[in-house]
């Protein structure tokens, strides 16, 4: 009974919100509000704008290290496993690969914003 009541409530609330959002008109329509916005770039201009390669490399490096940190987050739970030696070995190997990647980026001057 509680499941049916919850489902009916959720569906009816969703339908009411969708109906209100669909039927309410925009109060003030300006050209700025009606035009598409794409990260500050003019959507009607050429798609081949000059782009800073240094910014791209720093952004990709940040994304890679951010992903690697996300892979390190489950380590405290992995420490509770029965084979602690294997877990610590893989963790140390993973951190070593991270450190080597960071050292390589640093040596290639990929982390410097200005030259």
From Swiss-Prot:
Q: Name one GO molecular function term.
A: NADH dehydrogenase (ubiquinone) activity
The record, for InterPro entries, names: NADH_UbQ/plastoQ_OxRdtase_su3, NDAH_ubi_oxred_su3_sf
State whether keyword S-adenosyl-L-methionine applies: no
Q: What is its main location?
A: mitochondrion
Q: What is its EC number?
A: 7.1.1.2
Example of a GO biological process term: mitochondrial electron transport, NADH to ubiquinone
Topology in membrane: Multi-pass membrane protein
Note the SS bond partners. Answer: none
Cellular component, GO, one term: NADH dehydrogenase complex
Location of the protein in the cell: Mitochondrion inner membrane
Q: Membrane-spanning regions, if any?
A: 3-23, 55-75, 84-104
Q: How does it assemble?
A: Core subunit of respiratory chain NADH dehydrogenase (Complex I) which is composed of 45 different subunits. Interacts with TMEM186. Interacts with TMEM242.
**Biological role stated in the UniProt entry:** Core subunit of the mitochondrial membrane respiratory chain NADH dehydrogenase (Complex I) which catalyzes electron transfer from NADH through the respiratory chain, using ubiquinone as an electron acceptor. Essential for the catalytic activity of complex I.
Put simply, this protein is called NADH-ubiquinone oxidoreductase chain 3
